[in-house]
Amino acid sequence: MLVALALGAAAYLKRQAGPPERSRQPVWQKRFCVRVIDGDTIELDGGERVRLIGVDTPETVDPRRPVQSFGKEASAFTRRMVEGKNVRLEQDQDTRDRYGRTLAYVYLQDGTFLNAEIIRQGYGHAYTRFPFRYEQQFVQLEREARENSRGLWAR
């Protein structure tokens, strides 16, 4: 009797829960980078602007601020890495920022993870204002860049 009651309750709860959630598999897009706006923003074919998730580099194009120290170097690094090249995009839970830019992780054809590489080389830091999939990895990469005096962390 108890077994039947338990099975009935489980079936009822399953129906109430609705359909199972889709797995959070990344959605990949293959695209072409036509230009680099700054160290953490690129423009793709079709004019779409992409803000790299979890990365903040010194500003170079914000009209409200002067060019920040190491901003030109960060922009040049991103330009060398992706401008004029095919890339793959992976999105996270938030797909657009407040400026309408696409939010994405960017990968090169050889598999290099651009967002992580910018932080690893010291061209930017982990931007943790909002939660994201690779947050702990990026925080660790920034710590290592600081400890090894890479890029903007050079003494």
Where does each model-flagged region fall?
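Small beta-barrel nucleic-acid-binding modules, primarily SNase/OB-fold domains
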Residues: 1-155
